[in-house]
């Protein structure tokens, strides 16, 4: 979750390995993140590039304006496809519109901005319409959690009827409260399947996890559960529940839910994998240290210590002020930066909102809790640690995570570095989903004995 704090602390010393159209590192990385969903039909390269070239460099309002135009246009395509009965085309257009709506609202500075919430709701609406035309069964789930619920999607390996004869054509893309676009299912298999549980990190939403987890899992013979926890997506937007460092308190209820649904969902409880993406690499490691039912863990990427990462990107005078407890000076410094730099303003406001903190100083010092230093030896399940060669969010930390897995035999842990030559040097290997998924799932297949 502290990824972007680290980025802003390096605003004047950026040396990112890739600049895509934009010189602004935030715009470049977010564009790549959006384009990366092309692999699973969540984007089209030409649409993304045409949108990007219309955006004014470093202008957050221009970013929103141009992406929302593209999203609305593709959304209208999807509606027309539904009206004409072109359901495959509608599926693809809804997926792209969902991604573009998410991208449009991403950089809106004020969390209370109604455009932010509207863009996310439209992203979710388009995704719901897309999954109604998938050839496999997907259902929304509600995971009981401390008197409330965590939202999720369960993607069944079980295949739906692959013809569209059971779908009633309608011109209305909003299927809320309607079963008109749900196909009848084939008779469920009696087999139980390995299942991948995926959560994001600092800024992803539930629907984005389809491309980054569910789609490759289904292709390789895995069920998949994606969910949002405290500080993420709807849980922070609607329930106002901030991040928590003790993520096992989140994952244990998820495993309880899985156990309660194991027969209905054809889940092999002896083969359940947890994967955390981006800052989720910290969260998943924390959960794996304390939840014994995790069969294997994927840290995508590894995070050793959030506070150390922040300090490594700050000038000495500011580190000294933080460690001396000079909150007034620290807050004043960041307040000045927020007035002059929209990147700083966005990241600080988003960080304080999702963590429930009230000042930059409180946000930064709160990162001390987000450390795996003293818990890695508690992890007993096979663990895969990923790293981008030139990812400067947590430089050198994934290797420390791997080396800290002292309770695991060499055969039960693996550390993979994605190189610039491969195109995978960016944070979370953004832009190379093919090789990333190949390495993740080949390792999981070997660990779990799955044949994909």
Protein language model features and the residues they cover:
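N-terminal cap/lid segment of alpha/beta-hydrolase-fold proteins
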Residues: 67, 121-187
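Primarily recognizes the serine-hydrolase "nucleophile elbow" in alpha/beta-hydrolase
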Residues: 102, 269-317
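Short substrate-entry loop that stabilizes the transition state in hydrolases
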Residues: 162-165, 188-193, 198-218, 233-234
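Alpha/beta-hydrolase active-site loop
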Residues: 242-264
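Short beta-strand/loop motif that positions the catalytic acidic residue
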Residues: 379, 385-387
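Conserved alpha/beta-hydrolase "acid-adjacent" motif
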Residues: 392-398
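Catalytic histidine neighborhood in serine/cysteine hydrolases
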Residues: 405-424
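Catalytic active-site module of serine/aspartate enzymes centered on a nucleophile-bearing elbow/loop
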Residues: 429-452
């Amino acid at each position: 979750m502290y990824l972007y704090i680290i980025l802003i602390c390096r605003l004047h010393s950026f040396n990112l390995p890739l600049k895509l159209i934009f010189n602004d590192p935030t715009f470049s990385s977010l564009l790549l993140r959006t384009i990366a969903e092309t692999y699973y039909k969540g984007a089209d390269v030409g649409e993304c590039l045409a949108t990007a070239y219309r955006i004014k460099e470093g202008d957050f309002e221009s970013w929103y304006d141009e992406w929302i135009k593209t999203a609305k246009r593709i959304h209208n395509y999807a509606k027309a496809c539904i009206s004409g009965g072109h359901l495959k085309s509608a599926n693809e257009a809804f997926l792209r519109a969902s991604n573009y709506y998410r991208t449009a609202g991403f950089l809106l500075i004020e969390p209370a901005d109604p455009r932010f919430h509207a863009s996310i709701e439209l992203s979710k609406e388009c995704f719901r319409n897309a999954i109604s035309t998938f050839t496999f069964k997907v259902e929304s789930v509600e995971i009981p959690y401390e008197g409330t619920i965590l939202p999720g999607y369960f993607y069944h390996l079980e295949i739906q009827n692959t013809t569209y004869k059971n779908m009633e054509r309608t011109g209305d893309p909003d299927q809320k409260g309607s079963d008109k676009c749900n196909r009848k299912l084939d008779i469920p298999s009696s087999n139980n399947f390995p299942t991948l549980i995926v959560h994001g990190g600092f800024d992803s939403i539930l629907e984005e996890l389809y491309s980054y987890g569910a789609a490759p899992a289904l292709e390789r013979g895995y069920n998949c559960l994606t969910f949002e926890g405290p500080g993420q997506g709807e849980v922070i937007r609607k329930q106002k529940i901030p991040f928590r460092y003790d993520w096992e308190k989140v994952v244990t209820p998820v495993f309880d839910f899985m156990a309660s649904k194991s027969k209905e969902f054809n889940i092999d409880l002896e083969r359940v994998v947890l994967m955390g993406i981006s800052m989720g690499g910290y969260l998943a490691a924390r959960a794996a240290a304390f939840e014994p039912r995790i069969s294997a863990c994927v840290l995508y990427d590894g995070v050793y210590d959030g506070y150390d990462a922040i300090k490594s990107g700050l000038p000495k005078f500011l580190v000294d002020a933080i460690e001396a407890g000079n909150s007034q000076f620290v807050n004043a410094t960041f307040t000045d930066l927020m007035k002059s730099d929209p990147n700083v303003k966005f990241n600080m406001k988003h960080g304080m909102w999702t963590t429930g903190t009230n000042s930059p100083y409180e946000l930064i010092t709160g990162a001390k809790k987000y450390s795996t230093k003293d818990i890695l030896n508690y992890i007993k399940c096979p663990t895969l640690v990923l790293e981008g060669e030139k990812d400067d969010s947590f430089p050198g930390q994934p290797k420390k995570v791997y080396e800290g897995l002292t309770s695991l035999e060499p055969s039960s842990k693996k550390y993979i570095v994605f190189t610039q030559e491969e195109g995978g040097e960016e944070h979370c290997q953004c832009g190379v989903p093919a090789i990333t998924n190949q390495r993740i799932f080949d390792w999981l297949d070997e660990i779990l004995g799955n044949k994909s």
